[in-house]
């Protein structure tokens, strides 16, 4: 291990100086030295989440809740987020379907059909092209800048927001969103899931959690796991672009990082695409 074996005072400082693996080793050492200190276990929990070691992460958080009652609600929340993260993976494998808040536009079914085709490139492209032909652009504004259209940089999603609300993994088309409000990240787990308040085109409001990191990033490099960059891989087929790392939307006026997004409005109609 490089530099010093003393754990930095904040996780932010730790991940600037050490690899995730080194950080986990140091946090584990702190837990061994202070087994009854919930804060040490909470630091280990956050690092294990970044590494995608879901079962160990939840175990540490459950121990925190047993030690200090103020962790009980957080333990319940992150059990839901981790469960939805694992379910999310099966959706991208074409094995499960996401939930929806409103009746989905017909093109969403084409995106899901493309996922179910796996590596049959002809069918993947056929279904995704069908979706692309049916999608209508949704403009809006974010953090003070305007755009005429927006889409996730991972083509498997297109103009769809991934989120968790009510313990369910949701796909929400941009055309069904009126506004998003999300604070700046303050903790390590915000690199995976960030709180957001959503207003839909029908006026309904939801407290939810955005996915700020792409599915599968837990197995990538530290730079991608920590959302310091985004990487893309083409294929299978001509229409597939898979992303890892920090979640990014492409727009007509530049890219939007979901980590940096504080406020976004969409110029959508209630019946768009349905």
Task: Show which residues each predicted segment covers.
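Residue at a conserved register position within TPR or TPR-like alpha-solenoid repeats
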Residues: 14, 48, 82-83, 117-118
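TPR alpha-solenoid repeat register
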Residues: 40, 74-75
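Short coil turns that delineate tetratricopeptide repeat
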Residues: 35, 69-70
